[in-house]
């Protein structure tokens, strides 16, 4: 099963990184204020980056790696990834 690592841009300009095996369902949850406490208080959110991984473990590792990046590096990833 493939997993998706994604980055959202929140209303305040912050970036949220997550992972899911059903991107449409997860985005719907985020936009409804049920996706997580961080995004709930920063609606609306916009999807700005996605990356597919083959397994859950690979997605978890990539999500963690992106979360460790500086904001500048995340913005570069988002800009070059599209």
Predicted regions and their residues:
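GIY-YIG nuclease catalytic motif and its immediate N-terminal context
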Residues: 1-82
């Amino acid at each position: 099963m493939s997993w998706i690592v994604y980055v959202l841009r929140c209303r305040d300009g912050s970036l949220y990184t997550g992972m899911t095996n059903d991107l449409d369902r997860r985005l719907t949850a985020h936009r409804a204020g049920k996706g997580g406490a961080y995004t709930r208080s920063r609606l609306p959110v916009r999807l700005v980056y996605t990356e597919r991984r083959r397994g859950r473990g690979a997605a978890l590792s990539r999500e963690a790696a992106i979360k460790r990046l500086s904001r500048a590096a995340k913005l570069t990833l988002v800009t070059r990834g599209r």
